[in-house]
Amino acid sequence: MFESYYLEKGKEASAMLRAQTVMKYTSEMGDYYYNVGVQDLTAGLDFIQDIEKDHSVYFLSSNLYDVDNNELLFKDHVILDRNGLKVGIFGVTREIQLDAKNIKTKDYVVEAKRKIEELRPQVDILVMLLNATQRHYQSHLNEFSDADYIFTSLEDAKTRPEVEQPIGKPFEYKLGIQGKNIGRCDINIADKNKPIRDVSSQMMMADIFSQRLSKLQEKDPKKKIEDIYKNSPNVLATVERLRKGIESANSVLNNTKNRSSFTFIPLSRSVASEKNILKEVDKVLDTCKKLDEKGLKLTS
């Protein structure tokens, strides 16, 4: 929810208002489940619990406990039913702020293994949300092998969707930390007893190669592409290569029963916005600017 694990002096009010606004509007878009991580507790435990009460927002954590009573602070998992497919989701974080004295962080590896063992028999697809950097969790990936998907936050680098995920291991996706993209994962299951194959690279190939062919065709839409470039053997060789690539990609897509694909959607100005929401967000940003000006004056 926050850009950092601490609140910048003088900008506390605007940071909290931004976080509240994000939670408010995402809650109106559907069911969102958030793994509680170090950058969600920036404004303290009460702040995040109040957001959960005020909006239809769902926070998950399997390893954050109340120091006093040793009870979980958030729902530790959820099982969703999507067209007869049971999807289990749970989340863990490696660490939180050192000054969060009322929160106990249990070992995320131990708790993740416990949740995987508990949920695996109950679900068709098991999703693990992990708030940690790759250098901390990489050596433990084999211990999470019974999960189907691992989505990580806190890592600077993002997953390259064009690199195919290996069959037989959890599909691992690093979402980055800057909030400039939304990661989207689509899953199509036809046979629960067969493995899932990542077809992101094939989908990208078919799409990009088709676009390149269309671009070549634009020179003269009324002619066959072979006639347009009959005197350009190098271009014709490229056309043949693009067609074979599309054919190969479509063959995989058509013959894969259980498909999974992942892509990043850039949050640029080209993304269509709901006008009413955009209007409200602009108001909030204007308010944040004023709050920052006021806060910085008070701290100077």
Give residue spans per PLM region:
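Acidic, metal/ion-coordinating pockets
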Residues: 1-300
